[in-house]
């Protein structure tokens, strides 16, 4: 929002500079979003992409994703952008409509700058820590999924099914003690296969 302090300006500058120094072009897959991605240290292995660029930063919110879209995404001209963001918006009291609106602005900005780009949006997870706000999480995901259907090269991937057990309870063994962030098994068993499949789908649609 206008006037909000740029909490992660320094972190974003360091992140983008570090990537520019080592990234080999063209970038096939770029991850961007909040700490769920920032902490995905095994992403290159789990997604079977040794050259993957991971630009997860801070405890970012969707408006910060829009704020830094040039530095973290557009400047690297990726073929596929994989995004996870929204959890921190929910914690901050944002409405589902506001979260979805900013995600759509982000997607449209990327598409306008990079024609033909594929976008994978990973659903906000229904973390145990957010149990009292699952209704907002669900509504935000529904709105974002609908927005993804508006673009031919957008894929919405819902990881929540894999994060719940047969009794429809969160698989707590996949979470750290904070009930929000994940253990390596969650990335390996749930995020990796689901996101890989989504990337393959969006690549196929991008190729036409």
Model-identified regions with their sequence ranges:
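A short helix->loop->beta-strand "cap" motif at the edges of active sites that frequently abuts
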Residues: 114-118
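Charged helix-capping and loop-helix junction motifs
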Residues: 96-106, 134-141
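Conserved beta-strand scaffold positions in the cores of enzyme catalytic domains, especially
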Residues: 31, 52-54, 156
